[in-house]
Design a protein with these regions (language model features):
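Extracellular/periplasmic carbohydrate-active domains that bind, remodel
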Residues: 1-488
Length: 488
């Protein structure tokens, strides 16, 4: 391998032996360029136009991995490509030594990824090039923290960063990102901007992070979560995810690859996600989260789930448009899955959630807006204002008397519970529910009430515009105080 040039601040990977022909394994040359930059205090590692077949790339402090327009990092298939010594092109999963049973393997192990870093500062991945995870697995191959034989030697994430600070990911495109396109755990003071991702599993997983902005991103994930915040036990302790600001993003659930090629083929109604979610891993909880000026199309909507004994509070959502909504537009829930240390006895909780200026059309009739707490620990203080939802309709009269399952220890996914008793809003175990300037409509006749409140107190409903069929009440209260609806 070539020795490389004198340090100039820019380290062209071709000067370190990279070919960029899509056939030669170039990750050793890329890693050599990174090490050369580090030896000289950092710099830009430049990938000019070409296709760079790669295994694991190890990011280091003060390095910018710059993938220029026309350049592609292509994840190698470990069954077809080996390192010079015959070993896997992907690094082995690191030793965890903590509590791997408290989160999925994808949240436990980072080194078995295409691009990874741990404990680094001031790193960036930039440029208008592409990361193509063709050779990555999209399976969670290390369930319950056990490195199974089938997972050894594979790469399962496009970008995996742990305990890093001052991270910037900007302008790149990720296609087929493996299990997670980007996972950042315990990474503070970071920015993701103008990133496009078109993948079959999770797009962005932001776990146990603080002080982060995510802006101007296009995220297409038909089979899993698009942009998900988590607070898992991956750092061997409960860490809150907080001070996260997300704006000007497009979230979709088109068939994988069709956002990038411009054909935009919708997936059929079924397990289509593409949603924005908090959870499910939620040991540390969430605080001070803002989502604004985002669009959703052919995807599920907003999901806020606290089920692992954390606290979810101070959540603000505004200026959201959705079209062709699968499963549900808005879902807020707490539960007691409690996947974490048994000595933690404090229950999950949620409070102070404000959602405003939302318009959504062609919403699946299976689920209304859902706000459900627990019998002994209700959700406190939810504001829903200036909301317009247009449903497909089709609900029957019998559904209002349906016993809608308690969340309890169940996995928090509304479609598993089936039809909601209301077509517009179903709330249970809530104290402080404030509805203002809300409109619901349906396309086909729907014989459910617009709103069903079960064990809900301190309710205000102001300017509710929600028609019902003849003989069907607009608002039904079950084990709740009677609620006056104020019309202007």
């Amino acid at each position: 391998m070539a020795a490389g040039p004198a340090p100039t601040g820019v380290y062209n990977v071709r000067d370190y032996g990279a070919k960029g022909d899509g056939k030669t394994l170039d990750s050793p040359a890329i890693n050599a360029a990174i090490e050369a930059a580090v030896a000289n205090g950092g710099g830009q590692v430049l990938l000019p136009a070409g296709t760079y077949l790669s295994g694991s790339i190890r990011m280091k402090s003060n390095v910018d991995l710059h993938i220029t327009a026309g350049a592609k990092i292509l994840a190698a298939n470990p069954k077809k490509v080996k390192s010079a010594d015959g070993t896997s092109v992907y690094d082995e999963s690191e030793s965890f030594g903590g509590f791997p049973e408290y989160q999925d393997g994808g949240h436990t192990y980072f080194h078995n990824s295409l691009i990874w870093a741990e404990g680094q500062t001031n790193i960036s991945i930039t440029g208008h090039g592409m990361i193509d995870g063709e050779g990555l697995t999209k399976k969670d191959t290390e369930k319950a923290g056990q490195v199974q034989g089938g997972s050894i030697g594979t790469g399962d994430k496009a970008i995996a960063l742990k305990l890093c600070r001052q991270v910037t990911i900007r302008d790149i495109t990720i296609y087929r990102g493996g299990h997670f396109g980007i996972i950042m755990t315990g990474c503070d003071l970071s920015t993701i901007d103008n990133v496009t991702i078109d993948t079959n599993r999770d797009g962005f997983d932001i776990d146990c992070c603080k002080y982060m902005t995510i802006t101007n991103c296009k995220i297409n994930t038909p089979s899993d979560d698009a942009l998900v915040l988590k607070s898992s036990y991956a750092l061997k302790k409960a860490v809150v995810t907080e001070h996260i600001a997300i704006s000007n993003c497009n979230i979709t659930g088109f068939k994988c690859g069709t956002m990038l090629d411009g054909t935009y083929i919708p997936e059929p109604v079924g397990w289509v996600c593409g949603r924005f979610k908090l959870g499910t891993e939620s040991n540390g909880g969430y605080r001070n989260i803002a989502l604004t000026n985002c669009t959703f199309m052919y995807s599920s909507g907003l999901a806020f789930e606290e089920v692992d004994q954390g606290k979810m509070e101070n959540i603000v959502v505004s200026n959201i448009t959705m079209s062709h909504v699968h499963h549900y537009p808005i879902y807020i829930t707490t539960g007691c899955r409690n996947r974490g240390p048994k000595e933690v006895t404090e229950p999950s909780s949620a409070r102070d959630i404000q959602i405003s200026n939302v318009i959504a059309d062609d919403c699946d009739s299976l689920c209304s807006i859902i706000v459900t707490g627990m019998p002994d620990v209700p959700i406190h203080n939810v504001w829903l204002s200036n909301i317009r939802l247009y449903f497909k309709g089709g609900g029957t009269r019998e559904l209002v008397n349906k016993e809608y399952r308690e969340q309890g220890t169940n996995y928090p996914e509304p479609k598993f519970a089936g039809w909601t008793p209301a077509y517009g809003l179903y709330a249970r175990h809530v104290r402080g529910l404030h509805i203002s300037d809300v409109t619901f409509r349906y396309e086909r006749p729907d014989y459910r009430p617009a709103v069903v409140l079960d064990d809900v107190g301190d309710v205000t409903i102001h300017a509710l515009d929600a028609p019902t069929e003849a003989g069907v009440e607009q608002v039904v209260t079950l084990s709740s105080e009677t609620v006056p609806v104020i019309y202007d």
